[in-house]
UniProtKB/Swiss-Prot annotation:
Single biological process term from Gene Ontology: response to hydrogen peroxide
Gene: hcp
Catalytic activity entry: A + NH4(+) + H2O = hydroxylamine + AH2 + H(+)
GO molecular function, one term: peroxidase activity
Cofactor: [4Fe-4S] cluster; hybrid [4Fe-2O-2S] cluster
EC category: oxidoreductase
Binding site for [4Fe-4S] cluster: C3, C6, C15, C21
Record-linked SUPFAM superfamilies: Prismane protein-like
EC number: 1.7.99.1
Function of the protein: Catalyzes the reduction of hydroxylamine to form NH(3) and H(2)O.
Keywords, in A-Z order: 4Fe-4S, Cytoplasm, Iron, Iron-sulfur, Metal-binding, Oxidoreductase
Cofactor note: Binds 1 [4Fe-4S] cluster.
Stated name of the protein: Hydroxylamine reductase
InterPro entries the UniProt entry points to: HCP/CODH, Hydroxylam_reduct, Prismane-like_a/b-sand, Prismane-like_sf, Prismane_a-bundle
């Protein structure tokens, strides 16, 4: 543990074995888990709020949960576990809120093929998560001859009707956040970072990068009030992109789109044509070992379907997995917050087969990197989902004691190898 939030912290530098206040490492671990999960909720609530959607119950809970982590407030382990699970419950509410706000503003996502090539002409590359920022940029660039490209978690934007209607939203450039320094350096146009997942830029592209909203970078112009004039003018002044052919990625399998296939899916399961579903997704990152997810999906048998979301999908969304009776074997459900869609599909299947989610032929193999992923994990635990595999490593803020509780109650486990995990899951 490490805690230095009060004046009496050990040695004036930090408590590392037990708190001077009396809290042990497990309480400290759960307090960290609560705070980290609340950060994830805050991100989703911020996006929903920008679209005019708010939930007073979520706001009130955030105050209550933060209060529990103050010095000398609560030393009860079980109460801390309850609060951590309630973080998951509130994250479910806020993901639903954000999904509803996105659909009301931009329409329900629909399966869409997205080009990874480039068009001749000036371009702007948009990274992050904020669909409203992208919409405003598209509106302001209409008729300018500037093409707009998505990057990273912005890929699913192409599936929303009110965004895809802009003909100058032409494709997706690059991959996940950790590759941006190379990809942004190679992209000759202007670059806009809208939320988290920006990195301190290299000098080679700093002067043509911009941030807006919550994002900020040193030496980079910050756009206020969604007036993207400086970005547009910069794009016009830069060398145009060349026409380059690329492949295609498919996104847009929002739960509304997937549930339209529910009859086909149920029939395929009953006929033995679909043996198992895998949710393989979450965050991507630079840590070695994430090739596990590529190899895992490559080795998934042909009678299984893979659902994915978040930027972790870039490890395998280029693979052509084909289909089963017209049902794509790889279904990209969207951004990390579209974990809500995955849950809706799981609940609908459980209802159709008259069983619990844990009794479905469904396995979760998650990749995590940051705080939103922790909030989603807590949501899954709140719902009682068991047998989740997580990687590439377990969270450092979970002590052996807390991890033991999660393993005993939920059978939460680290990934091992694709071969071993598939064998254990499928038998």
């Amino acid at each position: 543990m490490f805690c230095y939030q009060c004046e009496q912290t050990a040695g004036g530098s930090g408590c590392t074995r037990v708190g001077v206040c009396g809290k042990n490492e497990d309480i400290a671990s759960l307090q960290d888990t609560i705070i980290i999960g609340l950060k994830g909720i805050a991100a989703y609530a911020y996006h929903a709020g920008e679209l005019g959607a708010r939930d007073p119950e979520v706001d009130a809970f955030m105050h209550e949960a933060l209060f529990t982590t103050l010095t000398n407030v609560d030393f009860d382990l079980n109460r801390h576990i309850e609060t951590a699970l309630k973080v998951g419950a509130m994250n479910l509410r806020v993901m639903e809120l954000l999904d509803r706000a996105h659909v009301e503003r931009f329409g329900a996502p629909e399966p869409t093929k997205v080009s990874t090539g480039t068009k001749a002409g000036p371009g702007i590359l948009v990274t992050g998560h904020d669909l409203l920022d992208l919409y405003e940029l598209l509106r302001q660039t209409e008729g300018t001859g500037i093409n707009v490209y998505t990057h990273g978690e912005m890929l699913p934007a192409h599936a929303y009707p009110e965004l895809k209607k802009f003909p100058h939203l032409v494709g997706n450039y690059g991959s996940a956040w950790q590759n941006q320094k190379k990809e942004f350096e190679d992209f000759p146009g202007a670059i806009l970072g809208t939320t988290n997942c920006v990195l301190i830029p290299k000098e080679s592209y700093r002067e043509r990068m911009f941030t807006c909203g919550i994002a900020g970078l040193p030496g980079v112009t910050h756009i206020k009030n969604r007036d993207f004039t400086p970005v547009i003018e910069k794009a016009k002044s830069l060398p145009p992109l060349e026409e380059k052919a690329g492949g295609e990625l498919t996104t847009g399998f929002h739960h509304q789109a997937v549930l339209k296939l529910a009859g086909q899916i149920i029939d395929a399961v009953k006929a033995g044509k679909i043996r198992h579903f895998f949710l393989v997704g979450g965050c991507d990152g630079a840590k070695p070992g994430r090739n596990y997810y590529t190899e895992f999906v490559e080795k998934v048998p042909k009678d299984c379907v893979v659902l994915t979301l978040g930027c972790g999908k870039y490890r395998f969304n280029h693979l052509d997995l084909g289909d089963i009776d017209g049902i794509p074997r790889l279904l990209d459900m969207g951004q990390c917050n579209n974990a809500y869609s995955a849950l809706q599909v799981a609940l609908a299947l459980a209802d159709a087969f008259k069983c619990s989610v844990n009794e479905l032929p469904l396995s979760l193999v998650l990749s995590w990197f940051e705080q939103k992923a922790v909030a989603i994990l807590l949501t899954l635990l709140h719902l009682g989902v068991r047998n989740i595999r997580i990687g590439p490593s377990l969270p450092a803020f979970l002590t052996p004691g807390v991890l033991k509780v999660l393993q005993e109650k939920y059978n939460l486990k680290p990934i091992t190898t694709p071969e071993q995990d598939l064998k254990e899951i499928l038998g």
